[in-house]
Amino acid sequence: MTSVLGLLKPLKKAIAAIAVLVLCIGCVQAPTISENPWQEIDLNTDSTFANIAFTDDLQHGWLVGTKETLFETTDGGKTWAERVIDLGDEKESFTGVSFSGQEGWITGRPSILLHTDDGGEHWSRIALSSQLPGAPYNITALGPNTAEMVTDLGAIYKTTDGGKNWKALVEGAVGVARTIERSADGKYVAVSARGNFYSTWSPGDTEWTPHNRNSSRRLQSMGFNGEDKLWLLARGGVVQFSDDTNPDNAEAWSEPVTPQYRNSVGLLHIGYRTPAELWAVGGSGSVVVSKDGGDTWFRDAALEEIPTNFYRVVFLNENKGFILGQQGVILRYDTSTEAA
């Protein structure tokens, strides 16, 4: 009996060691890319940036953020100059910006809508109704005098006369939203303020369609990949994609992946450089990339020491992209250096 117990002790130790090894595999960080394709730009502001857009001249763009922050570039985003629009004594935060040609729009809280038809040389303010459900969250320029605006309660409006009149596209609001994203073909996805459910809307729908989250983890944000496929980010840096085998089922999702392998780090937004290459950004300088549609991921370790959270990544095309952070920090995608 003693000899049997003596054999069991080493066996138990071996099993325990294997269990620890298995658990630690999930703690290992993702591999790193060999070269960093992002250039850090520090602007003279302590604001958090919300969005970025360019005119039909990709050298000329605008950047908006909290505290009425507005910056303009005329060299493709290499350098930026701060611009000031007199909004009186109101304390506003700009939330969205969009251009179609030289015509542009800026939204802001609590009730700001600005319009330009000369690339931003002159901005005019458009009065919004006091009955507007929620505050302007974002806007999409669609063509001459045409734009679509969404509020933080999910009310969607469209103008075809330069902002003089607006038509409601949805009868009911979705409730306070954490994030709202629009696809190129006009679909929307909104994450609830607490992250416990999400809602979708397609052109022609009269109401938003609610969907339960697919796990116990609260949702951080959702969006589209440019090809009508949804991505999802949940607490702990978890990434999922709508299931290709069920394109019409908004509740069918791929297996969850954790690119950072660090549950304490949250990812907040995804941007697609190409249909296969996507970048995810988040807290504590987190930037990760996948070049196979989201199956495998690599860290950009060169950016992890930047003392900021990254909230949004935007690609205008394969060669021009930006990551927006806080405390005046943005990153510019520089094609002179390619990621591995």
Swiss-Prot record:
Q: Is Lipoprotein tagged as a keyword?
A: yes
Q: Which GO terms describe its biological process?
A: photosynthesis
Membrane topology designation: Lipid-anchor
| Keyword list, A-Z | Lipoprotein, Membrane, Palmitate, Photosynthesis, Photosystem II, Signal, Thylakoid
The knockout note for this entry states: Deletion has no effect on PSII activity.
The primary site where this protein sits is membrane
Note on domains (UniProt): A 7-bladed beta-propeller torus, about 55 by 55 Angstroms, with a depth of about 25 Angstroms and a central pore.
Entry's family note:
Belongs to the Ycf48 family.
Name of the protein: Photosystem II assembly lipoprotein Ycf48
Q: What is the originating organism of this protein?
A: Picosynechococcus sp. (strain ATCC 27264 / PCC 7002 / PR-6)
Q: Which gene encodes it?
A: ycf48
